[in-house]
Swiss-Prot record:
The keyword Transport does not apply. One of its GO terms (biological process) is cyclic nucleotide biosynthetic process. This is Uridylate cyclase. Slightly more active with Mn(2+) than with Mg(2+). Pfam families: Guanylate_cyc (PF00211). Keywords: Antiviral defense, Cytoplasm, Lyase, Manganese, Metal-binding, Nucleotide-binding. It comes from Burkholderia cepacia. The keyword Nucleotide-binding applies. One of its GO terms (cellular component) is cytoplasm. Its main location: cytoplasm. Changing D52A: No cUMP production. Mn(2+) 2 binds at D52, D96. Mn(2+) 1 binds at D52, D96. Changing Y50A: Decreased cUMP production.
Amino acid sequence: MALADDLKKWVGETFTGKWEVQETTSVPNPEDLRLNSNHAKDLKAATVLYADLDGSTDMVNTKKWQFSAQIYKTFLKCASDIIRDEGGNITAYDGDRVMAVFTGNSKNTSAARCALKINSAVLDIIQPAIAKKWQTDFVLRHVVGIDTSQLRTARIGIRGDNDLVWIGRAANYAAKLTNLAGKPTRITADVYNKLADKLKYANGVDMWAPEHWDDMGIWTYTSTWKWTV
């Protein structure tokens, strides 16, 4: 019963303890927060990007494991390097997707350009490499979801095995947007409205199409455009 007693004590203290919240303008590391106490960091404005493979379950069920491993490795490597090149902070890998947080004055523009570059990497780098190596009709599809909001983060887990959890609309909506297949890039209207014009228009043509997200009751924007890496 020692474990049960310890857990009851810890859970009780977590629900009754007072939160210490510190404002920050940058993405913290897990070590910046205390693990076993109600300690959080508050980003007043941050933009979250999720890049996710679409159809990976079918791929694993029908393709050789080596093929699937190469798809995972190349997609996540390209997405991660592009995220970092655009100033994003990688905060988590979850199976076939990567999460990143962008801060600063150009966070929405940087995140959107990142998404278009990931699309370019898929179309112009990964897909040609697939065709060169494998005789297959497989088409790599992905979705990048982006939202912006206030975010809080807290440290979760146990000593020696812990990470950060992100609490806020952007973290949830960006992840959920990747569940909407059909378009490689999806952003909320809050992100679109804060984009620099160079990320909205190409030769006077809007690169984004409005689409209502019925489940959440908000407007989003989709794009099939790419931005050369």
